[in-house]
From Swiss-Prot:
FAD binds at residues 144-147, 165-167, 171, 182-184, 223. The keyword Transmembrane helix does not apply. Pfam families: NAD_binding_1. It catalyses: 2 reduced [2Fe-2S]-[ferredoxin] + NADP(+) + H(+) = 2 oxidized [2Fe-2S]-[ferredoxin] + NADPH. The gene is PETH. Keywords: Chloroplast, Electron transport, FAD, Flavoprotein, Membrane, NADP, Oxidoreductase, Photosynthesis, Plastid, Thylakoid, Transit peptide, Transport. May play a key role in regulating the relative amounts of cyclic and non-cyclic electron flow to meet the demands of the plant for ATP and reducing power. Disulfide bonds: none annotated. NADP(+) binds at residues 147, 167, 223, 255-256, 285-286, 295, 324-325, 363. This is Ferredoxin--NADP reductase, chloroplastic. Residues 86-208 form the FAD-binding FR-type domain. Belongs to the ferredoxin--NADP reductase type 1 family.
């Protein structure tokens, strides 16, 4: 507990003392108890002059100043958890279309839901979906979170819709049984006009940086592209009175086949529109290899620009965002460990500093 101190100070003379003599101070004190209140009398010698300080210490707690955190991200006015599982929002499916080719390993769907302006989300946030039906215990299904794939204005430009990018989950378990993901199959099977129960918006980890001159490196695998579609629309397809992107956006997207490249045409139009501000690199693991004949995963593609990426990471206005499969983290760390070591830096310590500075942002599953 901090103690509040009140003090009365008296000096025998107000005559000024030359600076040359103000070289030291000596304090002595004697504690006196009076009416159970501790008093402190102190003789203070400053530059040859002696004065007395009488101080009373009390148990009153001194106010502690609250240190405000000033985020580098677009956090001002951000809304989270407007709709919770116990009080969700019911919207409707307006559009649901498959966006992967027939030869792709798995289906991915782009869907648009109405929210009539009731879910005011930002780029980088997520919404929850509560699928219809009950689980094996007879209870309602729990919500699943999905990164939002649309800009706040929505795909229709009226601020009344939210879009998701969802891969249908189907796999064979250890017993040889085919298992279907509850929420992903519910969403991929939705017909226009069907109701969908939503929660949110949630999340601040993946919000865009405020700095319009920043370097923003986006690392995505598969449906992890969702938040970056939202980012890039804001940067290159929209006009804002208070924001014009003049920095560098660099997207790395890793997928298994060419027919799995999500929103490819949109990104290529952005690159054509702003070639000086947008770099685009795909890594197609089942179709491409590097000069060593190794499969082209996202970290393999990044390794081709390793020194350039490392130099960018040394800048205080470079922000990295990673979204998608958790497995890509190790491969990216492996690249950075050796690069940092060349400069005598421990990568994992440096990454902690980047995270603390909001320059390394991860959302993986």
């Amino acid at each position: 507990m901090a103690a509040a101190v009140t003090a009365a100070v008296s000096f025998p003379s107000t005559k000024s003392t030359p600076l040359s003599t103000r070289t030291s101070s000596v304090i002595t004190h004697e504690k006196i108890n009076f009416n159970k209140v501790p008093l402190y009398y102190r003789n203070v010698s400053v530059g040859g002059k002696v004065g007395t300080i009488r101080a009373v210490a009390s148990d009153v707690e001194a106010p502690v100043a609250k240190v405000e955190k000033h985020s580098k991200k677009m956090e001002e006015g951000v809304i989270v958890n407007k709709y919770k599982p116990k009080n969700p929002y019911t919207g409707r499916c307006l559009l649901n279309t498959k966006i992967t080719g027939d030869d792709a390993p798995g289906e991915t769907w782009h869907m648009v839901f109405s929210h009539e302006g009731e879910i005011p989300y930002r780029e980088g946030q997520s919404v929850g979906v509560i699928p219809e039906g009950i689980d094996k215990n007879g209870k309602p299904h729990k919500l699943r979170l999905y990164s939002i794939a649309s800009r706040p204005l929505g795909d229709f430009g009226d601020s009344k819709t939210v879009s998701l990018c969802v891969k249908r989950l189907i796999y064979t378990n250890d017993n040889g049984e085919i298992v279907k993901g509850v929420c992903s199959n519910f969403l991929c099977d939705l017909k226009p006009g069907s109701e969908v129960v939503l929660t949110g918006p949630v999340g601040k980890e993946m919000l865009m940086p405020k700095d319009p001159n920043a370097t923003i490196i986006m690392l995505a695998t598969g449906t992890g592209i969702a938040p970056f579609r939202s980012f890039l629309w804001k940067m290159f397809f929209e006009k804002h009175d208070d924001y014009k992107f003049n920095g560098l956006a660099w997207l790395f997207l890793g997928v298994p086949t060419s027919s799995s490249l999500l929103y490819k045409e949109e990104f290529e139009k952005m690159k054509e529109k702003a070639p000086e501000n947008f770099r685009l690199d795909f890594a197609v693991s089942r179709e491409q290899t590097n000069e060593k004949g190794e499969k082209m995963y996202i970290q393999t593609r990044m390794a081709q620009y390793d020194r350039e990426l490392w130099e960018l990471l040394k800048k205080d206005n470079t922000y990295v965002y990673m979204c998608g499969l958790k497995g890509m983290e190790k491969g990216i760390d492996d690249i950075m460990v050796s690069l940092a070591a060349e400069d005598g830096i421990d990568w994992f310590d440096y990454k902690k500093q980047l995270k603390k500075a909001e320059q390394w942002n991860v959302e993986v599953y």
